[in-house]
């Protein structure tokens, strides 16, 4: 799962796409009106859409934009640090830094212990090999 900032950026990108799609739809599916005293101009490349259908589509596009806005608001509200002071955030960072240093030390200690155990295993294997070689020499 993506982090909140990535989700927020994705939602903003999606909302911009929705805005563009809505504007494109409005631009291509608008109704023609005649100006005072002039005859109605028509464009054969523009599909004929009833007023009812146009309104229903515009309402659906508007609802989609509202839902996306709510998602963005939710993500913004869920960002860490919202509602806490800068001092509190700095204290939290210091606490996490100390925790990280502690776990770095634990990791370092475990690696050191692993190296010591490997060295001990090497010594034991070497002793066993020497004893086996000594036994093989005596049995000849």
UniProtKB/Swiss-Prot annotation:
Alphabetical keyword list: Activator, Coiled coil, Nucleus, Transcription, Transcription regulation
PANTHER family, per database record: MEDIATOR OF RNA POLYMERASE II TRANSCRIPTION SUBUNIT 21, RNA POLYMERASE II HOLOENZYME COMPONENT SRB7
GO biological process: negative regulation of transcription by RNA polymerase II; positive regulation of transcription elongation by RNA polymerase II; positive regulation of transcription initiation by RNA polymerase II; regulation of transcription by RNA polymerase II; RNA polymerase II preinitiation complex assembly
InterPro entries reported in the protein's UniProt record: Med7/Med21-like (IPR037212), Mediator_Med21 (IPR021384)
This protein's GO CC annotations: core mediator complex; mediator complex
Domain of life: Eukaryota
Function recorded in the entry: Component of the Mediator complex, a coactivator involved in the regulated transcription of nearly all RNA polymerase II-dependent genes. Mediator functions as a bridge to convey information from gene-specific regulatory proteins to the basal RNA polymerase II transcription machinery. Mediator is recruited to promoters by direct interactions with regulatory proteins and serves as a scaffold for the assembly of a functional preinitiation complex with RNA polymerase II and the general transcription factors.
Family: Belongs to the Mediator complex subunit 21 family.
GO molecular function: RNA polymerase II-specific DNA-binding transcription factor binding; transcription coactivator activity; transcription coregulator activity; transcription corepressor activity
Name recorded for this polypeptide: Mediator of RNA polymerase II transcription subunit 21
Record carries keyword Disulfide bond: no
Major localisation: nucleus
Subunit structure: Component of the Mediator complex.
Subcellular location(s) per record: Nucleus
Coiled-coil residue spans: 52-130
